[in-house]
Amino acid sequence: YHQYVDAVNHFHTSEIKAEQRRMLSIIRSSPHTGYYVDIFRSDVTDGEDRYHDYIYHNMGTGSEFFLLSGQPMPMSASPLDSLSGKGYSYFTTLGSCENPDNFYVDYHLGIDDTHMRMFVPTGKGRTVYQLNSLFNHRYYEPSLRTLPVPALLIRQKSEAWDHPFIAVYEPYGNGAKSQIRSVY
């Protein structure tokens, strides 16, 4: 039983001479389960690829980062640097890890047993940051409106066109078990 929906987005900006493409697919694996596949490519077209960032926010009360073995991801206290730009000051760094192997992140909603599990294959020259961002006053759940939003940033210190960011997201909980074990 498989159904899918595919969406492709293409972004070109003249301010920084970059081209970005995102492909997002929704895959239904059963009448009650499914997952999302996100592939994001980024290329600086008129200069040096210093770095590219992939950012994901998930509503909820927190996140936990794990290696595929199930062990917690070893995190250091290295924060995002001030050269990242003005918008990055809205993030609080909870930890970071350089060049991790394949890993997953478990985001928990915190008001019931709802989770989002994010699987990310390894990539060279990457630093993964566990972050909190500002609260989102528009959440449908009032108890979450004043809490920081759990987030992740993956910084790749090279081109991200031939080596794109890939993430697979699987919602689970409230009786639905996580089906995905790894992504390579």
At which residue positions do the language-model features occur?
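CBM-like, beta-strand-rich accessory domains located in the C-terminal region of large
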Residues: 1-184
